[in-house]
């Protein structure tokens, strides 16, 4: 028996329907992304790429500020946060209703994105293996389901 929760996820208080495929469009704000054509640096480039993602039918914009390509430059947590702040400020201004995911493997970066910009999805390519605080951070910002609240 399927339950309602198996087809939806809570994204900042709204349900995102996953009973049908949901495409996630990638927005790289790194100067050294694997694919040169995906490197967005200016407000105009970021805005245009976000609009393209949505126009092509994606339900989620996944923004990343740390390249995962082989031999990519190591970026400090501070630099990753500054890049994301710039990108997220642009997205919140130009596409306020868009569902935003942040691609990071760092718990501190994820925390900043949730606290300062209300990001509801964290996309960690390392699945918590590169930062032992990632699971704790995600759990801290996960709303309990009504069923879990009843058990407390």
Model-derived features: where do they sit?
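Conserved small/polar residues in nucleotide/adenosyl-binding loops
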Residues: 141-148
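Alpha-helix-loop-beta-strand connector modules within alpha/beta enzyme cores
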Residues: 76-100
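Active-site-adjacent beta->alpha loops and helix N-cap segments on the catalytic face
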Residues: 75-83, 108, 128-139
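Catalytic beta/alpha-barrel core
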Residues: 99-105, 120-129
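Glycine-rich, proline-tolerant flexible connector loops at the mouths of alpha/beta enzymes
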Residues: 34-35, 61-83
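Active-site mouth loops of central-metabolism enzymes
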Residues: 31-45
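Conserved, mostly hydrophobic/aromatic
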Residues: 27, 57, 122
């Amino acid at each position: 028996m399927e339950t309602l929760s198996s087809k939806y996820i809570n994204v900042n208080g709204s349900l995102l329907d996953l009973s049908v495929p949901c495409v996630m469009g990638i927005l790289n704000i790194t100067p050294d992304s694997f694919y040169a054509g995906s490197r967005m640096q200016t407000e105009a480039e970021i805005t245009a790429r976000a609009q393209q993602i949505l126009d092509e039918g994606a339900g989620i914009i996944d923004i990343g500020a740390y390249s995962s390509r082989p031999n990519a430059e190591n970026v400090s947590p501070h630099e990753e946060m500054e890049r994301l702040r710039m990108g997220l400020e642009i997205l919140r201004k130009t596409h306020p209703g868009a569902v935003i995911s942040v691609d990071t493997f760092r718990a501190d970066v994820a925390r900043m994105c949730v606290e300062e910009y209300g990001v509801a999805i964290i996309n960690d390519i390392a699945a918590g293996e590169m930062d032992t605080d990632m699971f704790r951070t995600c759990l801290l910002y996960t709303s309990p389901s009504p069923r879990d609240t009843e058990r407390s």
